Amino acid sequence: MQGGGGVSCAVAGDAPSSTRGGGGGGMLGLTLFDPPGGEQPAERIGRLVRESPVVIFARRGCCMCHVMRRLLAAVGAHATVIELDEAAEEAAASAAAAAAVPALFVGGAPVGGLDGLMGLHLSGRLVPRLREVGALCG
């Protein structure tokens, strides 16, 4: 990830690419702290959560973030993964009402961290909820 308060996005299961601006590897080229049109970071995060069926706020190198991505990929879910640097993490936590990273949102509603995801999965409610918001492959 490039320094200076940026954020990168990749679809769960894809390896992030070093290219920007929609290049290969699922990279969306999203910059959180330099958005076009004057959109503030909190507004941009809120919009991403509302517009995407499944959003994971993650940190590169976080083992819980990796487990969350792998579980969603294993059940066939399309997820938008937003990797935050330390400066962006504070804004995301504030804007998205997330206490910590990883933070998962399904259908615009907060699920929580890895414990919330595992609770849904073990109770058998994860796949139906993902299907309901249109996040499953196929």
Curated annotation (Swiss-Prot):
Cellular component aspect of the GO annotation: cytoplasm
Positions of region (Disordered): 17-40
Keyword entries, A-Z: Cytoplasm, Disulfide bond, Electron transport, Redox-active center, Transport
Location of the protein in the cell: Cytoplasm
One Pfam family matching this protein: Glutaredoxin
Residue span, Glutaredoxin domain: 42-137
Disulfide bonds listed in the record: C62-C65
Keyword Disulfide bond: yes
Keyword Transcription regulation set for record: no
NCBIfam families named among the record's database cross-references: GlrX-like_plant
Family per record: Belongs to the glutaredoxin family. CC-type subfamily.
Function: Has a glutathione-disulfide oxidoreductase activity in the presence of NADPH and glutathione reductase. Reduces low molecular weight disulfides and proteins.
Name the UniProt record assigns to this protein: Glutaredoxin-C7
Gene: GRXC7
